[in-house]
Regions:
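Helix-terminus/linker motif at the lipid-water interface of multi-pass membrane proteins
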Residues: 1-25, 43, 83-90, 151
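Small-residue-rich hydrophobic transmembrane alpha-helices
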Residues: 15-78, 111-124, 128-129
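Short runs within selected transmembrane alpha-helices of multi-pass transporters and secretion channels
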Residues: 31-34, 103-122, 128-140, 144, ...
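Short alpha-helical transmembrane segments in multi-pass integral membrane proteins
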Residues: 41-106, 148-200
Length: 200
């Protein structure tokens, strides 16, 4: 994304770097959560306790959603206090603060999809997420952002020449990705339901 935004100039590049850095910092929480939950789910599965594995998988996604919404709220409510930590340039502060509106949505979805993808690996589901990533994040997110920024005539005037189209497209694509992974995980959990659940 940064390579496509660089052609817009220093203001866009600086604002995008602030937004991207905050998104990366926030991502550390769901990444850590996903690693921990997948390790525990795999342990339960390896021990033959499918019920506990299913319960923890569902709990992990709920924790990811709640923590993602909390951090998204912090970004939304505190953006005018957070961005000035990075820069004192008024123009960069204004544009980066506007981008954080979309970064908040981006992170909420990113948190859910991150934990889902780790949990799906516990059931050896890897190909379907790869297809979803390639089609939605690269096709819809990156290519869609490029189209909105440089080729779509109906792009809002205040988005032109800014990184906003890229963040809008990426955020929407990530929301769809998160929903797809939640649906896929629910399907996997139903397919591999514990024996006692199937009997009851």
């Amino acid at each position: 994304m940064a390579l496509f935004i660089a052609r817009q100039g220093a203001l866009s590049a600086a604002s995008h770097q602030i937004a991207a850095n905050l998104a990366a910092v926030c991502y550390m929480l769901p990444l850590s959560l996903g690693i921990a939950i997948s390790a525990r789910v795999s342990w339960w599965r390896g021990a033959g306790h499918e019920t506990q594995a299913h319960q923890l998988a569902r709990l992990g996604v709920r924790i990811a959603l709640v923590s993602g919404l909390v951090l998204a709220s912090v970004l939304l409510l505190g953006r005018w206090f957070i961005v000035p930590i990075y820069t004192s340039e008024p123009a960069v502060i204004a544009l980066a603060s506007a981008l954080l509106l979309w970064v908040a949505l981006y992170h909420a979805a990113d948190s859910v999809q991150c934990v889902c993808i780790f949990v799906l690996r516990c059931w050896r589901v890897t190909v379907a997420p790869l297809v979803v990533y390639c089609s939605l994040l690269w096709g819809g997110g990156l290519a869609g952002g490029y189209g909105l920024a440089y080729h779509y005539s109906a792009t809002p005037a205040d988005w032109v020449g800014t990184p906003t189209p890229f963040w809008v497209s990426s955020s929407v694509s990530l929301v769809v990705t998160a929903l797809a992974f939640v649906w896929l995980l629910r399907r996997v959990l139903r397919t591999h339901a514990p024996l006692e659940s199937k009997v009851s």
